[in-house]
């Protein structure tokens, strides 16, 4: 983190964007035992996921917990009227595949009644990158959502 801090060319931590400062503050309190416990939890989740992949070729999840939000907003404060405690919450659906190192691809699945896009992430088992890419290619050839362009909003 220190080397990255130098790249910002900042005089003090308070000049960091709020999200980066939050990351720094949380990260500096992590101890070795915390990392070991996290690895143990990750391994348990990996076992559960491997069990799922015995029965399913892919897992499908939304690409986000909410539709795109106002461009001048750093992050939403609420999801479904529930106040969120960190900006990570609106991206939380990616946690599973990211932490477990699973090949994942997002594909467009349409728009809401305001014309805002939504996607679906397709997750494959470890080392099945080609399988998930081929699935996404076939899906796009059938549904071709990427050809639909909503009108730009002000």
Explain the meaning of each model-derived region:
Residues 35-36, 98-154:
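Structural helix-boundary/capping segments
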Residues 57:
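Conserved acidic residues
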Residues 37, 69-90:
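Short, surface-exposed loop/helix-turn segments at secondary-structure junctions
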Residues 63:
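Substrate-recognition/cap regions that form aromatic- and gly/pro-loop-enriched pockets
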Residues 1-50, 66-67, 103-109, 113-116:
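Short helix-loop capping/hinge segments that flank enzyme active sites or metal/cofactor-binding pockets
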Residues 50-51, 84-107:
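Small-aliphatic-rich amphipathic alpha-helix that forms the alpha element of a beta-alpha
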């Amino acid at each position: 983190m220190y080397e990255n801090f130098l790249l910002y060319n900042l005089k003090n931590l308070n000049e960091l964007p709020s999200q980066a400062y939050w990351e720094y503050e949380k990260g500096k309190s992590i101890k070795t035992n915390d990392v070991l416990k996290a690895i143990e939890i990750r391994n348990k989740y990996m076992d559960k996921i491997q069990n799922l992949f015995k029965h399913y070729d892919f897992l499908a999840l939304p690409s986000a917990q909410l539709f795109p939000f106002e461009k001048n907003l750093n992050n939403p404060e609420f999801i479904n009227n529930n106040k969120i405690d960190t900006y990570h919450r609106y991206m939380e659906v990616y946690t599973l595949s990211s932490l477990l190192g699973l090949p994942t691809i997002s594909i467009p699945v349409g728009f809401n009644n305001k014309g805002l896009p939504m996607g679906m992430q397709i997750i494959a088992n470890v080392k099945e990158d080609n399988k998930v890419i081929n699935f996404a290619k076939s899906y796009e050839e059938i549904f071709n959502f990427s050809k639909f362009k909503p009108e730009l909003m002000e």
